[in-house]
UniProtKB/Swiss-Prot annotation:
Gene clusters encoding host-selective toxins (HSTs) are localized on conditionally dispensable chromosomes (CDCs), also called supernumerary chromosomes, where they are present in multiple copies. The CDCs are not essential for saprophytic growth but controls host-selective pathogenicity. Residues 16-43 bind DNA. Residues 49-103 are annotated as: Disordered. SMART domains: GAL4. InterPro entries: OAF3 (IPR050675), Zn2-C6_fun-type_DNA-bd_sf (IPR036864), Zn2Cys6_DnaBD (IPR001138). Keywords: DNA-binding, Metal-binding, Nucleus, Transcription, Transcription regulation, Zinc. GO terms for cellular component: nucleus. CDD domains: GAL4. Transcription factor that regulates the expression of the gene clusters that mediate the biosynthesis of the host-selective toxins (HSTs) AK-toxins responsible for Japanese pear black spot disease by the Japanese pear pathotype. AK-toxins are esters of 9,10-epoxy 8-hydroxy 9-methyldecatrienoic acid (EDA). On cellular level, AK-toxins affect plasma membrane of susceptible cells and cause a sudden increase in loss of K(+) after a few minutes of toxin treatment. This is Transcription activator AKTR-2. Its main location: nucleus. It comes from the Eukaryota.
Amino acid sequence: MLQCAPKKNERLRGSCDFCTQSKLRCNKNKPSCRRCTIQQQVCVYSVARRTGRPPKHPRRADDSQETSGQHGHQDPMTSAPADSCEQQSSHLDLEGDDTDFTLVDGRTTAEGRATVAPPVLDNAFLMGETFEFNSLLDDPLVQSEDIFSFSPHIPRGEKGVHMASFHALNESTSPCSPSALLSIDVPQLPTNFRFLESFIGSELHGRNEPHPVEQPDEMEKTYDKGSILLGLDSAINAITNNGKDEPSISGWTVARPHSKHLCFCSMSMSKLQVLVSHPALCRQNSRTPFDMVLFLEEFVFGIHSDVLRCLICQSRSLHSLASLCICTDWVVEALVDVAQDLSLGQDNLGGLRAEICPPKNGSSIYVGRLILADQFRESCTRSLVKYRLRKLIPIMDTMIKLNYRGAGGALSQAIRTMVEDVRHKIESALGMMEL
């Protein structure tokens, strides 16, 4: 046990208690000062307070060590001499979570190793920092060229691609690396909602119930709730979360609110990178289906809103801004391609057809129980493309303001140039559609 240093000779105060309480000046005469003599008071000089740090008192041992000592068991990793300093630990409870982390200042016992937080979390708690899910662009071992240069090779003779099972994802060592992403096949967004729900929903969830597309009443409810694309979001979660079934975070579905200690902006950005860059979704020889373009546009808009509302990252990552700008440029290019196809009279709107019943005319568009007439098809689609392009302009303006807040540099200048180019491309596309 720690022994305190011997006390020094007690030193009296410089003024008596009566003068100290009255806040008057004392002449410090002893045994009685002048003021106490006049007032006929008892002059008392109290002991002065000791200066310096207070003495260290022996700490009380933990309950776990007392219990092990009573039963005669002792952990071989810890020593128990009488004069050793005991281990000091503190418990931190995360708000909104059920997990208790223990920050340990010394060596841990065998019973406490299972609940002790790793050193990275210890440093984050002690320094007042926050957790961060790094994107692929933030990894120094992964080059940005590798992320956006996926091989477009697809085996011949295969019309569709199949998704790897969750067991295969769990067995992979690094599923977020570019080589692992190439080995995982993301299901291609089909040209109708029936194939999308039957292909992805049956493999991920093992559903056997009737498909909502076959039931017109259920189709409208499913379309309103936005659950048609839940299978695709689960597939993206399987890739970005190491095969674990995590809550979906996307612009289409309701985003998970940011907690006080967690940030999901980088995770959402990684999902967007997988969607835009994977060869199974974006092929060079064919146009991207229109419903896929609309889905990615909603994804970009949702991520932009989440990043602005996030109080942890506060839009300080230039890598995230660069990735968001590249993905937005891809969406703008796809919308411009749709506008050009409309002007040339070509048909690239197959993704909007959810065929509830065999249509009399193959060019009709069915959404739920609503049928869009052929004479209004081009004008309505053109108005939809204009609306989506105009909605992206405020995003570009906000990205320019966020970029000016950061420190100057080559990456900041590159982001500024990219944002200006994308904004000019949007304005040119709107002008072309007006003509």
